[in-house]
Regions:
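N-terminal helix-turn-helix DNA-binding module of bacterial transcription factors
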Residues: 1-58
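Bacterial carbohydrate/catabolite-sensing allosteric modules
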Residues: 40, 81-86, 134-141, 145-329
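Central regulatory/effector-binding core of bacterial HTH transcription factors
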Residues: 84-130
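Short hydrophobic/charged patches on amphipathic alpha-helices used for structural packing
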Residues: 49, 103-106, 129, 164, ...
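N-terminal helix-turn-helix/winged-helix DNA-binding helices
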Residues: 39-77, 86-88, 96-98, 108-111
Length: 329
């Protein structure tokens, strides 16, 4: 079955079928006829031929830091929902938080035939920024804010402030488990939000009460052990991610601490782990799936329109979710 046979069965010209296949103008009446013939015959247009005609591959590269992350899976689900409906196929590139792998895949997608790239970023180095300056493929950053580039990012500072404002109502001695400050969003912004609220409430956050973890359950467990061995009187523990907070809860329970009576614990991210740990984890909900959808929509605009401003940015909202791991007043 070829395009000429489809045209003959539909009673239209070959050019009309070609326009239909390439999203050109075709009257609604003829669209219905052509669609019906294609469905009945099971015709599949040659992707190679379409690519030669349109110079489009309908492929999008998605660079992600960690394939087993609940946050990333929600973002990718949102990306996929939008792009697959528009006929795009995704190529997922898992970097395991390696800068070298990220740069490798950015180069690979730039030099090979993808129509666009979504880069789920954690740490943006000088090398990343230098490459992005010369990037000739439409690209959207997801998860980090970079001035002058299309990006979707969370309001991490506000999220941390809003959460801490709830916890200071019943907490006096605070500990915090962060991640590397090379991560602008999760590392710096969230810690800054916590510190700002504590300062306003005249609560000291001793620098020794801030421990640096690495996004994992194990690091949450280990850093909580370090923290409470040094400061056993901490009554409020905030973690930069839910995963680390669940690790913290595990250590506290194992060592006889009553949650939330002795120690209230909170994370950020509203992951499934926080909903199954006992007590359920107080957290901040980020709209990760929605942010994935917004990134996909923005990329489609960049790929399909010549009039999209390159500085388009979207800062996502968030909401505090109070559960059983915090003390009620």
């Amino acid at each position: 079955m070829n395009i000429n046979e489809i045209a003959k069965l539909a009673g239209v010209s070959r050019a009309t079928v070609s326009r239909y296949l390439n999203q050109g103008y075709v009257s609604e009446e003829k669209k219905k006829i052509i669609r019906k013939v294609i469905e009945e015959t099971g015709y599949q247009p040659s992707s190679q031929a379409q690519m030669l005609r349109t110079k489009k591959t309908k492929l999008v590269g998605v660079i992600l830091p960690k394939i087993d992350s609940n946050t990333i899976s929600r973002e990718v689900a949102g990306i996929s929902d939008i792009l697959t409906k528009q006929g795009y196929q995704l190529i997922l590139a898992n970097t395991n938080n390696s800068t070298e792998e990220e740069l490798k895949y950015l180069s690979l997608f730039r030099d090979n035939q993808v129509d666009g790239v979504i880069f789920i970023a954690t740490i943006l180095t000088k090398q990343h920024k230098d490459m992005l300056k010369e990037y000739r493929v439409p690209i959207v950053l997801l998860g980090q804010h970079l001035e002058g580039y299309p990006c979707i990012y969370q309001d991490d500072y506000k999220a941390a402030m809003s959460l801490t404002e709830e916890l200071v109502k019943s907490g006096k001695k605070f500990g915090y488990i962060t991640v590397t400050d090379k991560d602008e969003a999760v590392g710096r912004k969230r810690l800054s939000g916590v510190e700002e609220v504590l300062k306003k409430n005249r609560i000291e956050l001793n620098s020794n009460c801030v421990k640096c973890g690495s996004f994992t359950l194990e690091s949450g467990y280990e850093k909580t052990e370090e923290l409470f061995n040094e400061y056993p009187d901490i009554d409020t523990l905030i973690c930069a991610t839910d995963t680390m907070a669940v690790g913290a809860v595990n250590w506290l329970k194992k060592n006889g601490y009553q949650i939330p009576m002795q120690v209230q614990v909170a994370g950020m991210g509203d992951s499934y782990l926080g909903k199954i740990v006992e007590p359920n984890l107080t957290t901040v909900h980020f709209f990760y799936k929605t942010s994935g959808k917004e990134a996909a929509r923005m990329l489609i605009e960049l790929m399909e329109s010549e009039n999209v401003p390159i500085h388009k940015e979207i800062k996502m909202g968030c909401k505090v979710v109070m559960r059983g791991s915090h003390r009620s007043i």
